[in-house]
Design a protein with these regions (language model features):
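Carbohydrate-active catalytic/glycan-binding domains of CAZyme proteins
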Residues: 1-536
Length: 536
């Protein structure tokens, strides 16, 4: 059996790999998207399906007002003592010497839940993980962050004992590692194998310099010695490798005794004419940070990536029977169910009757007008990840705005300061019109502002479509669902990427979805008959 990377396409970073018997799970970060954390299941490490979105209550995750790329950072999923343990950080500030990250622990008897109410685990850092030692003791690891550590890019990994009976941490913090010259040490996981404790961390920052670093010690407190090659995995030395940014590893031994590591990776698109080693030459990744898997071999008591330390497109699978490919469900959503399809998410807040309804008009998704796409509070946005470099997304909408502060339509979205929006609104003296707007690093542009497209009064429905073609994308519209007209604007798909956004809010990936806003607060709504996403 051969596994093709990435195993989780589109925005699925910071994988945490976990085994229960012959079942395997990966938890990934969701940042400002709700519900928080996505958990995938497999029995062969090749075919994966989404089975749980555990942080689905405000009591577990209150992100209203969180900044772009705040929210859920690097969850840690483990199984011990007959239940699943999930650690996560809700980051409230991203661009300062303070993160104000709030760490929590929830547990569940089954991966589907029910998940407990969260136990606070302190606010001193991020990327927490939990290690269950063979003697039953439990240890909590994380990267501390604050004014002093902010100025020191090496940072540290610290550990505290955790008492599961009282839900409390020991006040003593033990420093396990102070980093290598690669800097930006984070994403720590601890393992025990063949008489050694192994500490696996991410370093180099989560861009092209990203790497996995491993250390070991005979005692849990250390001292820890570095891997002979320092970096166990990185793609930094191979700029033409199709899988880049490889790092943030999570190790696992299968029930057949084989070893694998999940890691995050990205597939860059290179711009024509830009030299490989020039600024931007390595490319742009609109699909965000995805999840890959590597096969691990042990030599002289150290783990190594089979085939070399770089991320590889194909990997030999474990000695288990290949399972049927996961049924992903129709890529057409007719909104006939009583709840949103799990592939759809909202921004920061749950989908409730403030945002919309699936029952107000059966067979339609009704979105109520709320904040603009520029907001970080209450937005009526329902979207899904870009998972392919070429695809078409389409919807049919019924919407009757009465003034210019009301709009609804289709968006391609990276964060609150970088998106495009093809929408219907209202112009006095003209009636309903179709326009597009782009926000690029928070700078707006309205290419059709002087000549909007008039919607015929007889048009009961309006169809909107976006075609993404590798580096560019274009919107189009129809008034009958058969004859389509292109909006005369071409947008650059590569700009909806971590690499273009930069700064401190660049941890997600591009989404496409439906949106309705009413900044007047008068209370409009839009009804969406369907939403399709089809790779081309």
């Amino acid at each position: 059996m051969e596994i093709t990377n990435p195993i989780l396409t589109g925005f699925n970073p910071d994988p945490s790999l976990c085994r229960q018997g012959e079942d395997y799970y990966i938890a990934t970060s969701t940042f400002e998207w709700f519900p928080g954390v996505r958990i995938y299941h497999s029995r062969d490490l090749k075919n994966w399906s989404l089975v749980s979105t555990p942080l689905d209550r405000v009591s577990m995750l209150d992100m209203k007002g969180n900044p772009d790329s705040g929210g859920i950072w690097a969850p840690c999923l483990s199984y011990a003592d007959g239940k699943f343990w999930l650690l996560y950080t809700d980051v409230k500030i991203v661009d300062s010497p303070w993160k104000n990250g709030r760490n929590f622990l929830v547990t569940a008897p089954s991966i589907e839940g029910p998940w407990s109410e969260p136990i606070p685990m302190g606010n001193g850092g991020f990327d927490p993980s939990l290690f269950h030692d063979d003697d039953g003791r439990k240890y909590y690891l994380y990267r501390p962050w604050g004014p002093r550590h902010h100025s020191n890019p090496h940072n540290t990994i610290v550990m505290q004992a955790f008492d599961p009976q009282t839900g409390t941490l020991s006040p003593e913090r033990k420093t396990l590692f102070t980093g290598t010259p690669l800097c930006y040490t984070e994403g720590a996981h601890l393992y025990r194998h063949a008489g050694w404790y192994y500490l696996m961390v991410a370093e180099g920052g989560t861009s092209y310099e990203h790497a996995v670093v491993v250390l070991r010690s005979k005692t849990i407190d250390g001292p820890y010695e570095l891997h002979p090659e320092v970096t166990m995995m990185t793609s930094w030395h191979l700029p033409e490798n199709p899988l880049q940014k490889s790092g943030h590893g999570s190790l696992l031994q299968t029930h057949t005794g084989e070893w694998y590591m999940a890691y995050l990776t990205s597939r860059p698109l290179r711009l024509p004419g830009v030299p490989l080693l020039a600024s931007g030459g390595r490319g742009y990744c609109p699909l965000g940070r995805e999840t890959g898997i590597a096969r691990i071999e042990w030599r002289d008591g150290w783990p190594y990536v089979e085939g070399g330390k770089h991320a590889q497109l194909t990997v030999k699978g474990p000695q288990v029977a290949e399972q049927p490919a996961a049924v992903q469900g129709s890529r057409r959503d007719d909104f006939d169910a009583s709840s949103l399809d799990p592939k759809l998410q909202t921004l920061r807040v749950p989908f409730d009757d403030t945002l919309g309804s699936l029952t107000a008009r059966p067979g339609y998704l009704r979105l109520y007008g709320n904040d603009s796409l520029n907001s970080t509070f209450t937005q009526s946005t329902v979207a899904r990840r870009w998972q392919h470099f070429t695809f078409r997304a389409e919807t049919r909408m019924q919407f009757s705005p009465v003034h210019f502060q009301q709009s609804a339509g289709l968006t391609c979205y990276y964060n609150s300061k970088n998106w495009s929006y093809c929408f219907v609104d209202y112009e006095e003296g003209q009636g309903r019109t179709i326009k597009v707007i782009q926000l690029d690093h928070n700078v707006p542009s309205w290419p059709l502002h002087e000549q909007p497209i008039t919607v015929p009064e007889s048009a009961e429905s309006i169809w909107l479509r976006v075609d993404v073609d590798t580096l560019v994308y274009r919107y189009s519209y129809s008034f009958d669902g058969e004859t389509w007209h292109a909006v005369p604007v071409t947008y650059e798909a590569w700009k909806l990427s971590d690499d273009y956004i930069g700064g401190r809010g660049f941890f997600t990936g591009a989404f496409v979805g439906l949106h309705c806003e009413d900044i007047s607060g008068d209370g409009c709504h839009a009804d969406f008959d369907y939403f399709t996403y089809e790779p081309v």
